[in-house]
Each structure stands twice: as C-alpha cells, then as structure tokens.
Amino acid sequence: MKKLMLIFLGFTSVGFSQTTEIPDPNFEQALIDLGYDNAPINGSVPTANISEVTLLEVYDKNISSLDGIEDFTALNYLSCFDNQLTSLDVTNNVALIQLNCSGNQLTSLDVSNNPALDFLSCNTNQLTSLNISQNTALTELDCIDNQLTSLDLSNNAALTNLKLQTNQLTSLDVSQNTNLTFLNCINNQLTSLDVSNNTALTYLTCRFNQLTSLDISQNTALTALDCINNQLISLDVRNGNNTNFNIFYSTFNSDLICIFVDDADWSATNWTNIDSTSTFVNNEAECDILSLGDNSLVLDVNIYPNPTANYLFIEGNKNPLAISIYNLLGTEVVSEFNTHKIEVSELSKGVYIINVSDGVSQTNKKFIKN
C-alpha cells in the first residue's frame, strides 16, 4: 500500500510540474483572454495549453515581460508590438515564421535560432545592432526608428522589402539582395548607395541622407524615386522606364544641375518636384551646355512661357541682363543685353538653353521653341 501511494504521489508531482511560469500579470491576462489559461492570475499557465499554439497576438497589452514564451514551441506567428518589453527571448521558438515586436524598448534582439523567419518587424525600439545572418529565408525586414550604425545583409538574398528609415547607417550594401523590390533608407547618414545589382527594385526612397550621386539606370523596373534633401551633384534616371514612374521627387538638392532622364521633354512636363536650379537632360552633352560659365552665385530668375513660339520673358531681377541662347550643339544663336524680353520666333523648333547673367551671378535654363 505504501509503495502504491509513493507511485501515485510521483505521478501527481509530475502532473503538477507541467506548468509554465508567466511572471507578467498582463501577459497572463492576455493568455486568459485568449482561452489558454483560467482565472485567477496565479503566475503560471498549463504548458499543454500553449505548446501547440502556432499564432499568438498579444499586442498593446502593457506587457513588460514575455517570459514563458519559450514553451510556445510550435509558434509560427508572434505579434507583441506596442508593449513595454525591454528584452525578448525567442531562441526556443525555432518554428517562428513571422515576428512583430515593434513599439517596445528592446536594446537587443537575437533571432539567430529562428532560421524559418520570413518577416521581421522591429520598428521603434532602441536596437544598436541586429544580426540576421542566420535568417536566410527572410523576405521582409522593417527596422525603422532604431539606432543601427551598420547592417550585414550579405546572407539575405531572399529579401524583397527593406525598411531602415531613421537609423544611423553610414553605409548600406545591398549588392547581394537581388530580389529587392522596395527599399526605404530615409534619414540615415549614407554618403553613397549602389543599387546597380537590384534590377527588380520598383520603389526607392532615400531622402534625408548625404548622397552626392545616385545612378538608377540599371533599375529598369523602378517606378518610384524619392531622393529629397541629399547633397546630389549627379542623378542618372535613364532606366528606360521613366514614363511608368508614379513618384519622382528630387527637391532640396541645390547643387544638382543636371538630371539625366530618358526623355527630357517628357520629364519636364510630367515631373515637377525638382529644384529650380535643376534641369532634365538627355545626355552628357546637354549637361555640358548647362554648365557653361558655371558660377557659384546662381541668379534667381524665371522664364516664361515655356514652351514658346515667339517671345521669352524674364522676371525676378531688375539689374541689366546679358542673355545668350544656345542650341544643343553648344552654338550661341541669340545674344541680347539689357532686356527682359527676347524674340525667338526665328529659331527652329527644338530645345535650347538660355544663359541669363547680371554680371555677378547667372543661371542656365532649358526652354522649348514651338
């Protein structure tokens, strides 16, 4: 009888031991609400109730700790965004496919033991580094509003969507990410960006960096480009797909004189979000003409109407003006002084460059003669 009692007590002890500690009451309350635990809150949940769970949504629950998540061993999808987490251990959740832990206070995140991870969103945390070298299945990474200074993407060839806005990146190598279709690297410290290998790219936004040049001529699928507020002096958009663009922004690049495009006339008609100092050109020869007599003091004038058939008017400067008009071969075809009105009716139809100077500063602008 005594032996039977000991065996019974042993089985009872094993039975009672199959619980998982849940120290955070808000986490346990969320599990109660989902039907994985029963009230009242007692700091634990039956392990059998959670070991087969594949989807767990516990976002915006004021949770400070997800301790206990390690026993969700079948978990594929975890949404724990907008909580108060300062740490998150998913090393035991090896089946994890999607993880959204945005809007917390994480200073580190280890996903090295999650090889099946396809989607990772860790926006608005305090991450200074992130190692995704083991996540070769990853197709989307959202890591906006963190403190990353570098990111190694060399093992992530499956990536299609990459969002790294508002970090502290000084360089970004996407040469191995040839499946990339969407790239957001807004508000970093990038001085260069090479996307020549990313021929599948359709959307690129890189505003608020320190880029001095950008060449998207190899990105034949691109239909959206936003490079506002950089330090561009060279921008090549001749990708053969300009007429399919739905977004083009290049303002606040005051040193950008020439923007190389497929068809300068089409771009001038359809793309308006450029600086007044920038001009669309078809080739380097046209850009050379625009740079004639380059002067660091740019004259602020407007010309109208453009296109024109008979006269060009110049407004915005009351000083005596010297005006020269060049064809695209660089030949001066009109020269005038001390006037704000130029007759161009005798010019052949086509594109011309007008140089306007007041003796101190000058500007070059393109116009079309009908």
Regions found by a protein language model. Name each.
Residues M1-L4, K369-N370:
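Positively charged n-region of N-terminal signal peptides that target proteins for export
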Residues L4-L6, F11, G15-Y77, L88, ...:
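N-terminal capping/linker segments that flank leucine-rich repeat
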Residues F8-F11, F81, F119, F182, ...:
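Aromatic (phenylalanine/tyrosine) cluster motif
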Residues L55-N62, Y77-Q84, C101-Q105, C122-Q126, ...:
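Concave beta-strand-loop units of leucine-rich repeat
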Residues L66-I69, L88, L109, L130, ...:
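Canonical leucine-rich repeat
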Residues D71-L75, N92-I97, N113-D118, Q134-T139, ...:
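Short, solvent-exposed linear patches
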Residues C122, C185, C206, L297-N370:
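C-terminal outer-membrane/trafficking sorting elements
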